[in-house]
Regions:
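Glycosyltransferase specificity loop/lid
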Residues: 3-73
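An amphipathic, basic-hydrophobic alpha-helix
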Residues: 64-93
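Donor-nucleotide binding loops and adjacent catalytic segments primarily
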Residues: 23, 27-28, 34-36, 40-51, ...
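Active-site-proximal region of nucleotide-activated glycan assembly enzymes
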Residues: 32, 40, 110-173
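A short, well-ordered alpha-helix in the C-terminal region of glycosyltransferases
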Residues: 333-347
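C-terminal alpha-helical cap of glycosyltransferases
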Residues: 2, 346-371
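Acidic donor-binding loop of glycosyltransferase active sites
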Residues: 91-93, 257-272, 279-280
Length: 371
């Protein structure tokens, strides 16, 4: 057992959830875990009671000269604050998960000579990790290839995959049974944790124009924004499509395991969960994501044979209906994609990332004894 670890993450779910998964793995091994983030992580503090959460000052760069000057000042103060914290906590190593709130802690760890690593969830290196990559000892990636890494980073880089929550791991590689003639077809429609307007504007009308025999087979789970629920529900009801709509499903892993096909965004966590459970998907990347990273995530998934990609500007009800009719009528293609999705999954990501952290910590101990 190694005494303690520090995790630095931006204050949004995309950065915090992988950190939580690693924390759970390390806590299970008897270590203490400290999370260093900004005030946005307050809601996260209660998710795993054993994680000690510390707020570090940070601000996002960008905007005008005045904002940039303020942000640089906050980052400098946050780095000094993180240095004091890390000296007191004395972690075996420090792992960063991206997001601007991770920068002060990671710079502080580097300046103190602590063992460091970063984990990049997306198929494109994020801006914070792009700054930190040349400075840390190891780089872990969620995808087989990550744009933005330098050739010189290769020897320090390993693919661990993206850690997923325990509820997803419990359903890893659930057997896929393609829809058969006359049986129901389970569709799961997700637009990220807050839903997405395009999913409600384009997908229900597309399903409504499917042939009657196909519409009658559909069993739809649709996560939509609260303001979009009435309109989508009216379309489903008018066209006699069995659909359950909610603004947030608490049982997404179970619904995903039941699904014959998912229609969703291409965030790193979504793609990881699709792959670990092994479900085919039509991915519609959010076109305004930083560095267009969702498009890169979706392309990696599709290139593995696990699904299909439709750019948001090309998502029109009439053409999408024909697309779905052909796809849902091809059980062999769905089964093959489900198999390849499972092959693409990395259910041991949290364990492999924990092993990397432990090796870094043990290496530091060995160097300390030698000195």
């Amino acid at each position: 057992m190694i005494g303690s670890f520090a995790l630095a993450a931006g204050g949004t779910g995309g950065h915090l959830f992988p950190a939580e998964a690693l924390a759970s793995e390390l806590l299970g091994g008897g270590s203490r875990v400290h999370l260093l983030s900004d005030a946005r992580a307050e809601a996260f503090a209660g998710r795993v009671g054993e994680i000690e959460t510390h707020h570090v000052r940070a601000a996002q760069l960008g905007g005008g000269a005045a904002h940039t000057a303020h942000a640089l000042g906050e980052l400098a103060l946050g780095t000094l604050q993180a240095r004091r914290l890390l000296r007191r906590l004395s972690p075996a190593c420090v792992i960063g998960f991206g997001g601007y709130a991770s920068i002060p802690t990671m710079l502080a760890a580097v300046s103190l000579g602590l063992p460091t690593a970063i984990h990049e969830q997306n198929a494109v290196l994020g801006r914070a990790n792009r700054l930190l990559a040349p400075r840390v000892r190891r780089i872990a990636t969620g995808f087989p290839a990550t744009a933005g890494l330098r050739p010189a980073d290769g020897a320090r880089t390993m693919q661990t995959g993206n850690p997923v929550r325990p509820a997803v791991l419990a359903l890893a590689r659930t057997k896929y049974k393609a829809p058969q003639r006359g049986s129901s077809i389970e569709l799961l429609i997700l637009g990220g944790s807050q839903g997405a307007r395009i999913m409600s504007e384009a997908v229900p009308p597309a399903l409504a124009t499917l042939p009657t025999r196909l519409r009658e087979m559909l069993r739809v789970s649709h996560q939509a924004r609260p303001e979009d629920l009435p309109g989508a529900e009216a379309i489903y009801r008018k066209n006699r499509i069995q659909a359950e709509l909610q603004s947030f499903f608490t049982d997404v892993p179970e619904r995903l395991a039941r699904a014959h096909l998912a229609i969703c965004r291409a965030g790193a966590s979504t793609v990881a969960e699709l792959a670990v459970i092994g479900r085919p998907a039509v991915l519609i990347p959010y076109p305004y994501a930083t560095d267009n990273h969702q498009a890169a995530n979706a392309r990696a998934f599709a290139d593995a044979g696990a699904g299909w990609v439709i750019a948001q500007p090309e998502l029109r009800p009439d053409t999408f209906a024909l697309y779905l009719e052909n796809l849902l009528g091809d059980p062999a293609a769905l089964t093959a994609a489900a198999q390849r999705a499972g092959d693409f999954g990395r259910p041991d990501a949290a364990r492999d990332l924990a092993q990397l952290a432990i090796e870094l910590g043990l290496g530091s101990r060995a160097q300390g004894r030698a000195a």
